[in-house]
Amino acid sequence: MNILLSSTLFVLLMFQIIGSGMGCDMKVRGLDANMKKMILDLHNKKRQIVANGQQSGQPSAANMKELHWNDEIAANAQRSAETCVFEHTAKSLRKTTKYSYLGENIYKGSYPDPIPRSVNAWYDEVKDVTPAVVKSFSSGGPMIGHYTQMVWANTEALGCGLVTASDRNSYLFCQYGPGGNYRSQPIYKQGPPASDCKNGKSSKYPGLCN
């Protein structure tokens, strides 16, 4: 192989890598134990607020599950974050050995506190959710899908990945199993908190189900 051909192939390869986002210059990658706990706690606290009927304009939830951290989902989300591309992961790649479909929330920003900022931003979509949408999910209208995935009753597992690039932008990808946001399906069953739990109430979050 001559030098010119070798150089051409190298340039093409680098173009493919950078174009796919894999050429991102990562300053920080991954989540430590405290960061994982922060993300999980923020999600469950938000879910409990809604389940207990403490969120203005939202009915209480009879069957909303407590979320648990899942390392396989987190590894999947980390791979997506490391592309440094602010786009949802292809649905065909959002699955694990247990879950055939994972929901996903994504965030990009240059603020120094990406975890609380992203979770709060997703949750803030609650202002556009009506009891009618809780009863029958619809994606038409204002953006609400980040919030509705956060509080989807049947979702039980969470895993996230984080990258901070050299341009100071952070990319946080969170994936949820099983995924939610199914059109015409209820986000959760309306009723007294944790009144329709199949396996009892959570000991840490009594408004949520095990």
Curated annotation (Swiss-Prot):
Organism, scientific name: Scolopendra dehaani
Known tissue expression: Expressed by the venom gland.
Primary subcellular site in the record, as a coarse category: secreted
GO cellular component, one term: extracellular region
CDD domains for this protein: CAP_euk (cd05380)
Pfam families in the record: CAP
Annotated compartments: Secreted
Its job: Voltage-gated calcium channel inhibitor.
One term of GO molecular function: calcium channel regulator activity
Post-translational modification comment from the UniProt entry: Contains 3 disulfide bonds.
UniProt keyword annotations, A-Z: Calcium channel impairing toxin, Disulfide bond, Ion channel impairing toxin, Secreted, Signal, Toxin, Voltage-gated calcium channel impairing toxin
Name this protein carries in UniProt: Scoloptoxin SSD976
Family designation: Belongs to the CRISP family. Venom allergen 5-like subfamily.
Signal peptide residue numbers: 1-23
PANTHER family: CYSTEINE-RICH SECRETORY PROTEIN-RELATED (PTHR10334)
